[in-house]
Structure formats: C-alpha cells, structure tokens
Amino acid sequence: MPVTHASFPCSVLLLCGGRGQRMGGRDKGLLEWRGRPLIAWLHEQVRPLSDDLILSCNRNHERYAHYADQLVTDEDQDFQGPLAGIRAGMAVAHHEQMLVLPCDAPLVDRQLLEALLAHAGARPVVVRQGDYWQPLFCLLPTALKADLEQLWQAGERSPQRWFSRLAPVAVECPIDDPRLANLNTPEMLAAASLSADARES
C-alpha cells in the first residue's frame, strides 16, 4: 500500500536555498526542466505524502510560496550550506519525522521516498551509494533538533559529519542510480532531458 500523509504523517523539507554558483547564480529550484521548474517535479512527488510541506529558500519567496505550506529562510544570509536549511526546517516541522530532499533532483520517485519512510525510527535514515552517503536524501526524526542546534552553535556546518555521529540507517541505492542525480549545471540539465526523452521514446 503506498504511503500517504493520512497513513504516515511526516513533514517534508525541500532545500532551495543555495547560491546556484554552478548555474551562474540563478535560483536552481526555479530553472525550467522539460517545461516545468525543477521544484515542480519534486512537489508532484511529495505533495501526497504530507500536510506540512516546507521549502527552505533565501530568495524568490513569492514564487516558491505556491509549492509550500511553510517557507523558511536561513537566519544568516551568508549561505552557510544545506545544514542551515535543515536546521530552519526542523524548527518549524509539525511532525515527528521530516523527509529532506534537494530541489535539483527531479528524478526522485515514489519508490525511493517510500523506502526512506519505511525505516522511520529514532535514527536518521539516509540514502547510501556504495561507501558514499547522500545526506540530502534523508528522513530525520525531528526530536534531533536539539542535538543539531548544539552542534550548530559549536560551529558544525556539515550534514555528513552530523549524521555520522548518529549511526544512520542506510537505504542502499546503486552507484549509478539516476534518481539521485543532482542537475546542478546547465550541461547536466540538458543531458538528463535527453536521457528522459530516450527512455520515453
């Protein structure tokens, strides 16, 4: 049976707050891919999962508001990385679990999301490809926000280092899993579009 927010309440955080340096400073979540903004592809997948959809963004708030129940912004406008967005999201999340995804991964599918949700518990659940963890594809118990706040105040800014202290549960994915592709350069956007067209033809 597919997971829905009626059967498994969770918050969802979509991270849209980066500088977009590889995209020439453009806001990645609003870049068009196959006729729609990148954020729209993620929204389509996660909207049925939650009544608490949070977007972390530092600009273009009016455009992002269409895709969220809540918008959060980093306290510091100095772009301190994705952990800042996770911290802001955890501070306002309504549910005991929070699903986290980056805005530039439009190939994420329901099967991957359900695999993360199926392992919900007291520890973070994080995608792993071989020996490499993908810390921005994860499910976090919001009870960990005090632990995160303590480390943040001590200067920690790496999601990877934070998770490593918490014995995360792994959701194993192949090294070349296309669902985890971050389309964060113009070349990657174009290549992924061609690949998707080829699969559909």
From Swiss-Prot:
It holds the Pfam family NTP_transf_3. CDD domains: MobA. The keyword Metal-binding applies. The keyword Magnesium applies. It is an enzyme of class 2 (transferase). GTP binds at L15, C16, G17, K28, D74, D104. One of its GO terms (cellular component) is cytoplasm. Keywords: Cytoplasm, GTP-binding, Magnesium, Metal-binding, Molybdenum cofactor biosynthesis, Nucleotide-binding, Transferase. Belongs to the MobA family. This is Molybdenum cofactor guanylyltransferase. It comes from Ectopseudomonas mendocina (strain ymp) (Pseudomonas mendocina). The gene is mobA.
